[in-house]
């Protein structure tokens, strides 16, 4: 598949590739304003899915934390077993903490910059990926918007008004 460069950079397509994490130090947040301007000029709606990327690849969430989440009970046992093996394999040798933190920081800054510029954001969670359960995971996604600096009111718009506007 030549649609993206396997292992060349940390992007949504390559984040699960360990070698790609070596590119995080090269991420340049000074490029965010130009990217935001291009997105705004194109009239694009953006669905960051930050919680999926953070919880799956950037945050080392322990087994007890996962198992104590209220949504964990709604994941079928067979899926839990399969996904747990994949997750454990990924986290056996985690990317460096500094890289994971920088990745999260830049995504949060970009999310905030997009919102501040008036780019319509839409909340999405990529549920049912990994351990994301419909309903619960959208609340987690909204929390990432608020932690990025977006007001709770505007975070809620990303799950209500903005998708309505997008769909017409």
Where are these regions (language model features)?
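Mid-to-C-terminal alpha-helical segments outside catalytic/metal-binding sites
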Residues: 151-165
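Active-site neighborhoods of metal-dependent hydrolases
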Residues: 3-144, 148
């Amino acid at each position: 598949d030549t649609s993206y460069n396997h292992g060349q950079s940390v992007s949504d397509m390559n984040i699960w590739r360990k070698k790609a994490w070596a590119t995080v130090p090269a991420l340049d947040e000074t490029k965010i304003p130009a990217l935001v301007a291009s997105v705004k000029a194109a009239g694009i709606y953006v669905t960051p899915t930050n919680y999926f990327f953070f919880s799956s690849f950037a945050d080392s969430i322990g087994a007890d934390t996962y198992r104590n989440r209220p949504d964990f009970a709604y994941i079928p046992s067979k899926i839990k077993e399969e996904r747990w093996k994949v997750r454990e394999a990924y986290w056996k040798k985690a990317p460096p903490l500094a890289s994971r933190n920088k990745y999260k920081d830049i995504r949060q800054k970009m999310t905030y910059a997009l919102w501040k510029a008036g780019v319509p954001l839409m909340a999405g969670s990529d549920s049912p990926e990994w351990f994301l359960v419909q309903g619960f995971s959208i609340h987690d996604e909204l929390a990432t918007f608020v932690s990025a600096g977006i007001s709770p009111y505007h975070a809620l718009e990303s799950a209500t008004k903005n998708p309505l506007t997008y769909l017409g």
